[in-house]
Amino acid sequence: MAAMTNSSFEPLGRVRTKIVATLGPASRDPATLRKLVEAGVDVFRLNFSHASHDEHSATLQAIRKIGEESGRQLAVLQDLCGPKIRLGDIPGDVVECDFGAEFCLAAERKEGDDPHQLTCTYKTLTDDLEIGQSVLFADGTVAMDVIDRGPGWAHLKVTLPGRIRSHQGINVPSAALSVAALTDKDLVDLDWTAQHGVEYVGLSFVRQVEDITRLREELDRRKIRARIVAKIEKPQAVANLEAIVAEADAVMVARGDLGVEIDVSRVPAVQKQIIATCHKARIPVITATQMLNSMESSSRPTRAEASDVFNAVLDGTDAVMLSGETAIGQYPVESVATMSQIAREAENLMFSEFRLNAPWTWSVDNWPGANGRGHQATPSVARAGQVLPVTDAVVEAASAVCRRLNAALLVVATHSGRTALASSKQRNATPTLALTDDLEAARAMGLYWGVTALHIPELFETGQVLAWADDWCRANDLIASGDRVVIVRGVIPNNPNHNALLVHEVE
């Protein structure tokens, strides 16, 4: 049985919005990892575009150890590199791109050291280009138009001047590239996953449902139980959003490449659309990229960054993510603490009298851009991360009971975590404690808004769950005599009981 006391469990004090932190040279050492957890990190992102397998293995081992020592169920997100198209080596490493200057992009460099000869990692890119298309470099800071092309080459003319360096990114927003969603490197990285285990695998540059299906086949082939996070960063993914969300287990609003692939003025609206669609489908959504970007080199964020995090929480994101701020920044711990503080302020407004008495009240089914009220029913047989319709109905009733009775705590007994996920989408003001006998499910709940998970060796009968939760919460000073606790029991394997709801008054 889990320890009866756990000083790290603070459901009444911790922010409900989950925080994802990307690890790198500035943060992967055990001492900093521990400080990040104390500051509020719930999910650690391992970026497989950088670092070796040995480095990732050591980092993962440190995360697991800290999780055990702190009593926190920490989720790990493995972010696959995907088919990111980059420049090859440039003679001198950097070249100025003056307005009107011409460059040749080819699969292979000809003899000589002319910096106006460019190569890229995707050898058939030039075959996918058309005359008149715009090619973007270095996150869109440099643009060139295709003025001529032939087998294996394309002539480009600079329309947006700037500077490019070796290995910087290339984007072609209007091109339908034939590159596969999973690269050979990704498959090797999945072999690592099969040996070590993570809770989430991020798929980069998703364009269509088939990309997710392919990854799921590779996970199944390797017997990997990880949930799939579809990263929305291509215009094709936005066009196929509802189908992608229906197949994925979670979604990331990857605003970096998304802001290059579509006009930056559209990004806020698309962000709201993605979040609303994920709520409709009852899956977690992460808002990512440049949220506190200035904190890579400053101990305080800009006012605009604070507003960005605040409004993402009000939009309904389940999690907010830090990238360079924690991976390579000078203030990784301060970045997490700042993000937590901003999220707390947003949640205070979310549950304030002002917000509740607004012209329209907060509701996952009443969110602007959700394409209609209600949500799509999921199949009667669902994946681990999917919410069943009957489960959704029970937790909706439980949320209403919590509000009516001003409950002190909502306890969810679940095996797969579906019931806890459904509860998180209700956005309860009541703290939620999830009990599960599945360690991987407990860790995965690190991404679920407002849910604090505990791993226990077995799920008991409803009466035993009640007694266990009562004793545990008393030992941690979470409830007192006269408090009401609402208990929801999900579907338990090999148990004839279905979803159940009861109210317990603490004696």
Q: What does each of the following model-derived ranges do?
A:
Residues 1-507:
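Non-catalytic helical/linker scaffolds that mediate oligomerization, partner binding
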